[in-house]
């Protein structure tokens, strides 16, 4: 059993991939700008593309992406092949392309959390996001809120990335002279009344992501075929 340092049980959804494949796609747009002789500011490139994704269809127009640089146990893949898939009649444009890849970055997380929230009836007070996905203000937060149908809070330093959660647990063990419980340590020492900025999911986004994930799950056979046939 996985527990916190103070012995509380942990329900954990482990994902091997997040934004590595998405970053590779953004890198192509960087190369295109360089071909045009346009000075490249990567913060601007990410901001423009991420915010443009929010103009896409809530279900990404039928487009799906698999960000599987490596395998994903949650979906039964021991290996992965990054892949973008569309049908000829899907709504293919830049906004939907970017949105599909943003959805892909948290799709496995959604599948795992759906088991916890919908099947196991796990309830949470709030979810705090941290990592590079949240560096572009509001976008990753909105995508994750739609994925797990829950308000998402981010702190001011959310975009810095790193193993934030495990660092907090280490801090609890090393810097807890008052011998507080983990819950009290988080409330009094880490958040100290500052729960960050919260974004709640919209009904349209949630319905769109749910539709996307149905197509995503159906297409896992394509990912399996790629693993079997592309070395």
Q: For each of these PLM feature ranges, what is it?
A:
Residues 1-128, 133-231:
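Active-site core segments that coordinate phosphate-bearing ligands/cofactors
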């Amino acid at each position: 059993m996985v527990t916190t340092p103070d012995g509380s049980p942990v329900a954990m959804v482990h994902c091997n991939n997040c934004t590595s494949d998405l970053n590779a796609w953004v890198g192509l747009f960087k190369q295109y700008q360089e071909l045009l002789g346009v000075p490249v500011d990567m913060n601007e490139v990410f901001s423009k593309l991420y915010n443009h994704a929010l103009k896409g269809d809530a279900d990404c127009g039928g487009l799906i992406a698999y960000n599987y640089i490596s395998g994903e146990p949650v979906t039964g893949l021991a290996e992965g092949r990054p892949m973008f898939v569309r049908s000829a009649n899907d709504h293919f444009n830049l906004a939907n392309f970017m949105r599909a890849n943003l959805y892909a970055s948290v799709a496995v997380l959604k599948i795992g959390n759906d088991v916890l929230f919908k099947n196991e009836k796990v309830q949470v007070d709030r979810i705090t996001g941290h990592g590079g996905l949240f560096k572009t203000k509001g976008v990753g937060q909105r995508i994750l809120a739609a994925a797990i149908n829950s308000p998402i809070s981010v702190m001011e330093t959310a975009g810095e990335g790193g193993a934030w959660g495990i660092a907090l647990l280490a801090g609890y063990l090393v810097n807890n002279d008052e011998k507080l419980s983990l819950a009290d340590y988080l409330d009094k020492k880490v958040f100290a009344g500052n729960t960050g900025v919260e974004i709640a999911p919209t009904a349209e986004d949630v319905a769109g992501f749910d539709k996307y994930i149905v197509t995503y799950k159906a297409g896992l056979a394509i990912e399996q075929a790629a693993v079997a046939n592309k070395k």
